[in-house]
């Protein structure tokens, strides 16, 4: 993901920080938080904040807060992402050093231990460090005025870095959004903002984190409006824009100007093969709906199962992921099932990997592995796996067209894989504007925008028809959080298409029948 001398130096520095940061932060955790876990900064910082209140007008203070949030979120996102890359690089190096026989042990043990660490942290230390991170952000935003605790961000960083970096088949983007939302909220608390303004800092941090994680500032804006806020206002967009720009500058300064995927695809002129975006959209909608329903059903079954302790489940899923990943690696020579998997996805997108059996094995292995991880409650995100699924599905459709004699080259297959990424994102995440913007910014190829948009619309409409509630909101429902506060479902006209459980109240106040006024 990073290259060049500057990125090598940065990776070395990040490795040093990664080694000592948990110890330093853990020693100071109690001194920086009050009894409830909320931010409680030292008197020196309090005096600085008080001085700024006296010296700066309200507008200038707010501007300073947005700039600080962008800087802090950019640094947090880059450090977290590089930590994941470095940790998985260590796992790869150790497996290569161990040799053929012991490499299997390393590749199975690493995600097992990473899952164990994630499970212990998520059940014994900080329960909000488990899972993907987006649902926790939405719950804090709507139900707690966006007030996060410092320990939530810290333990999310540690748990998900260890889980994803050790090889569990998850992504870093959801945890990045969670960490940066908590960081922005903490800055708002530090400056003594009112609760409504602290709440407004959550989308600021979420957008800044996603911008730095993917190097996609425009997609970050769309995401917070589509998934988190549900509406656009001039006041909110100004702060989000500032933070997104600052975090993007931080990310590009530290890891480089290039896009996430450097593909070398040519500019495409309008051609008949772009009509394949329609079957790709249909396939992604079907697979995405099956994916969402499978996760939700297995989550419910996992809650009913008491035989395996909660803290042990991520370790067991990690062991299974290791076995699946090793099997796929032995059969294909590719390790894309493990961790983020962008290396193999890049090969497919650039047209260097066009063997259907290899692509299918990577797809199935990653699909099963992610479902195991998220059902077990392992700390990690969904964006990277979803993009991986879509890229592989799009490539398979493209290769099928080649085999049928349609006569296009490997670059077209790569373009169809890009379309698949956007379609799967729209199907599962349910953010259609974000879905095509994030693919465009990750690849910087504008010539496939029209088929990408058409495919995304097809995938989005079909997935909504087949499963009306998005994955995130369905998870919140399973957790007993009502959706009536969610902006996407405000207004009677939107409730008509939803099941009763989507708008019912879970926390009902009861009284004994014998009581009197």
Where are the language model's segments positioned?
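Alpha-helical transmembrane segments and immediately membrane-proximal extracytoplasmic
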Residues: 3, 7-10, 16-17, 22-497, ...
